[in-house]
Swiss-Prot record:
Any one of the GO BP annotations: terpenoid biosynthetic process
EC number(s) recorded for this UniProt protein: 2.7.1.148
Membership in a protein family: Belongs to the GHMP kinase family. IspE subfamily.
Protein name: 4-diphosphocytidyl-2-C-methyl-D-erythritol kinase
Catalytic activity: 4-CDP-2-C-methyl-D-erythritol + ATP = 4-CDP-2-C-methyl-D-erythritol 2-phosphate + ADP + H(+)
Keyword terms of this UniProt record: ATP-binding, Isoprene biosynthesis, Kinase, Nucleotide-binding, Transferase
Enzyme class, spelled out: transferase
One GO molecular-function entry: ATP binding
Domain of life: Bacteria
Pathway stated in the Swiss-Prot or TrEMBL entry: Isoprenoid biosynthesis; isopentenyl diphosphate biosynthesis via DXP pathway; isopentenyl diphosphate from 1-deoxy-D-xylulose 5-phosphate: step 3/6
Family annotation (InterPro entries): GHMP_kinase_C_dom, GHMP_kinase_C_sf, GHMP_kinase_N_dom, IspE, Ribosomal_Su5_D2-typ_SF, Ribsml_uS5_D2-typ_fold_subgr
Location of the active site: 10, 136
Length: 293
């Protein structure tokens, strides 16, 4: 059996860290949504008991360091799977960008393996299992728009956001998420209004969504990396209704109602930033998963 499955990137419409927990993680409230910048995974069931990864991108490990490999290994051990798998990853999501590319790939792998290994697990069960690998993966298992709490693994579904344009810009720097959280001072930062964001999404109010965007991690990343702030400022100067850093960065995204204005923001960033994308909110469709027996 062979299967192909889409792994969409995500952005944080709001990201709040409330306090540091005893386990070392921060208690978070994040409203996230998937976008149509996506990787594609191709899974082939093998009779031989082995996991083979083939990543069509440089600098991405194909062994136990990869979240996809960890996801496959976890399912094999948990359910005593004797079959193997070959997984080919066609990468489009930038690496180490704050867009959950690795987490989304792992989520897609879990869903694909559930099919080709005939495990019969529900989405809820897959999401629960995924939290053993990484905090963002549970959201990626569900996709769409959702509130994530706890350390990011507790997911409450929300309606999809109204149609708009999203311009992404990733500078050629890397950011350490653990370092950003370590330097975050939760008592000395402006916190986003998560409830306002949720209400705006439920009401289909784009202007309310734009106004409620916020990310406490900007207080650290923008201070340490001025080029990230310059990208955000440039987006707003070219007409973005809202601009925000995704995750711990370094990617910044602009939210825009009209195509013509989005194109102006996109063109204003090309040449200024190495990687620029113009995308839409993700809508699940019939081509998300294809199965060949």
């Amino acid at each position: 059996m062979k299967i192909s499955i889409t792994a969409p990137a995500k952005i944080n419409l709001s990201l709040d860290a409330l306090y540091k927990r005893e386990d070392g993680y921060h208690e978070v409230e994040m409203v996230m949504t998937t976008i149509d910048l996506a990787d594609r995974l191709y899974l082939e069931r093998l009779d031989e008991d082995k996991i083979v990864l083939d990543v069509k991108a440089h600098f991405i490990p194909e062994d136990r360091r990869n979240l996809i490999y960890q996801a496959a290994l976890l399912l094999k051990k948990r359910f005593d799977v004797k079959m193997g798998v070959r997984i080919t990853i066609d990468k489009h999501i930038p690496v180490s960008a704050g867009l959950a590319g690795g987490s989304s790939d792992a989520a897609a792998a879990l869903k694909g393996l559930n099919v080709i290994w005939e495990l019969g697990l529900s989405i809820e069960e897959l999401a629960e299992i995924s939290s053993e690998i990484g905090s963002d993966i549970a959201f990626c298992v569900y996709g769409g728009t959702a509130l994530a709490t706890g350390r990011g693994e507790k997911i409450s579904a929300l309606p999809n956001i109204p149609g708009c344009w999203i311009v992404l810009a990733k500078p050629s720097i890397s950011v350490s998420t653990p370092t950003i959280y370590k330097e975050l001072q939760v008592d000395n930062v402006e916190h986003p209004d998560t409830q306002k964001m949720i209400e705006s999404i439920k009401n289909g109010d784009l202007d309310g969504i734009f106004a409620a965007t916020g990310n406490v991690l900007e207080s650290v990343t923008l201070e340490k990396n001025p080029q990230v702030k310059r990208i955000k400022d440039r987006m707003l100067a070219f007409g973005a209704e809202a601009a925000l850093m995704s995750g711990s960065g370094p990617t910044v995204f602009a939210l825009i109602k009209q195509y013509s204005r989005a194109k102006r923001v996109y063109n204003g960033l090309r040449g200024f930033c190495e990687e620029v994308y113009m995308v839409r909110p993700w809508s699940e469709g019939e081509n998300d998963t294809n199965i060949n027996y």
